[in-house]
Regions:
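Residue-identity detector for glycine
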Residues: 4-7, 22, 42
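Short terminal hydrophobic/aromatic SLiMs and anchors at protein ends
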Residues: 2, 8-9, 15
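Low-complexity, intrinsically disordered or signal/transmembrane-proximal segments
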Residues: 3, 17, 51-52
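Basic polycationic patches enriched in arginine
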Residues: 15-21, 26-28, 59
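Sequence-structural signature of mature extracellular/luminal beta-sheet repeat domains
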Residues: 47-408
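Bacterial N-terminal signal peptides
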Residues: 30-44
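Ala/Thr-enriched low-complexity intrinsically disordered regions
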Residues: 10-13, 25, 37, 55
Length: 408
């Protein structure tokens, strides 16, 4: 028997398949939710900034692997009182950048190489080299029209003043002042009265010794009259050695004849990336502030490597007094170029390498050197009384005097 719809047989009647309609509804809801989610995700992705490629490290930020093993020295006693703006220039003239600074042969006066109220002397008619008495008064000056970029200096036992003029005029500067074409890339010897006595290098022309020099950073005259010159300045900004990369020390006779050259660009022993300053201890050892490599390298006077020290930081200026106290001034350190280290003046022993004191950076709205915080000098000198002088480059300019409050 065939039972019709609605019959009372125990066999269930056939009904419409309602679960299909419910499943379709649920699918529609799910698809709608997926569409809304996709739309929202699209909005978020559209609003999100595009991912930027990782920034390249700054030029010259690399360093020797050994440096990373040294714990930064930033927290030591500071036994010095800081006196900013030491020295008053004549005629109301303002200080410019100063990195060349040295005590006079008398141990009382200080010579400073002012970059003519700016950061170069091109076109200037003032004397860049000034002699300061203990009160900061200028008692002598010279060098007008002769020195373009005083960078490092020394005073020999006869009182002669040696100046490293580290760069030549730029094309833009020469367009205005063509008469400066033959200045720079030289080491100049002046008498105590400021008369030019000797020139090493060819003015305005970088190159190789003996005829030429490339960006001489500093000059040092040994007790026997031998002359040491450190080249070159821009090497600290290089991470790879270009064909013309320069990092060298040259030794010259007292009359200016080349004796020998040692060193090369690089990160290894007896290699340099910007040998920025020179000093000599009582034993006649030559200390080289290898700034780009964040270290001191120590040599005998024939160029034999004796030791390497990292504990004095990324040094711009270096001086050693008669007691073998070493003064190392750092104007550059920051998280890129010397991670973990602060700018400042570190004082210690040239005999043992121990660092005793740390004078922190000046407060400054703008940093010196490569960045970071604060400002500190680039050149350093010490007088016979133990007063220390910093030559300032950057937002803080002129000369700073550090007066010892305690005796060692």
């Amino acid at each position: 028997m065939i039972h019709g719809l609605g019959g009372d047989s125990t066999t269930p009647a056939v009904r419409p398949h309602r679960p299909v309609r419910g499943k379709l509804a649920r699918m529609r809801i799910a698809l709608s939710a997926l569409a809304l989610t996709s739309l929202a995700l699209g909005v978020v992705l559209a609003q999100a900034p595009a991912q930027q490629p990782a920034a390249a490290p700054p030029r010259g930020a690399s360093g020797p692997a050994e440096h990373a093993k040294v714990t930064p020295i930033n927290n030591l006693p500071n036994p010095y009182e800081t006196i900013r703006n030491f020295g008053v220039l004549p005629d109301g003239r303002k200080w410019g950048s100063v990195s060349a600074i040295n005590a006079d042969v008398d141990g009382r006066h200080i010579w400073a190489g002012d970059r003519c109220g700016a950061n170069a002397c091109v076109g200037s008619n003032v004397d860049p080299m000034v002699k300061l008495d203990p009160s900061g008064k200028v008692v002598a000056s010279f060098g007008k029209g002769q020195i373009l970029w005083p960078h490092g200096m020394d005073v020999d036992r006869q009182g002669n003043i040696w100046v490293a003029d580290a760069r030549s005029a730029t094309p833009q500067e020469l367009a205005k002042f063509p008469e400066w074409k033959d200045k720079g890339h030289t080491v100049l010897k002046f008498s105590p009265q400021g008369k030019l006595l000797m020139t090493i290098g060819t003015g305005g022309q970088p190159g190789n010794p003996p005829e030429k020099l490339t960006e001489p950073n500093d000059v040092l005259v040994a007790p026997d009259g031998s002359i040491f010159i450190a080249e070159a300045h821009q090497a600290q900004f290089l991470d790879q050695n270009p064909p013309n990369g320069v990092g060298r020390i040259t030794k010259w006779s007292p009359d200016g004849k080349l004796i020998k050259t040692f060193g090369a660009y690089g990160y290894g022993t007896s290699e340099f990336r910007g040998p920025h300053s020179l000093a000599m201890d009582s034993r006649g050892r030559l200390f080289v502030a290898d700034r780009g490599n964040r270290r001191i390298q120590i040599f005998d006077q024939e160029g034999k490597h004796l030791d390497t020290w990292y504990q004095f930081s990324r040094i711009s200026g270096l001086v050693i007094d008669k007691n073998d106290t070493l003064y190392a001034i750092d104007s550059e350190s920051d998280d890129n170029y010397n991670p973990g280290w602060r700018k400042g003046l570190r004082v210690g022993s040239a005999r043992t390498g121990k660092v005793w004191y740390f004078v922190p950076e000046h407060v400054s709205k703008q940093p010196t050197g490569m960045g970071g915080i604060g400002a500190m000098g680039e050149g350093v000198a010490v007088d016979a009384q133990g007063n220390v002088y910093g030559g300032e480059v950057g937002p803080v300019q002129g000369v700073t005097k550090f007066v010892p409050r305690l005796k060692r």
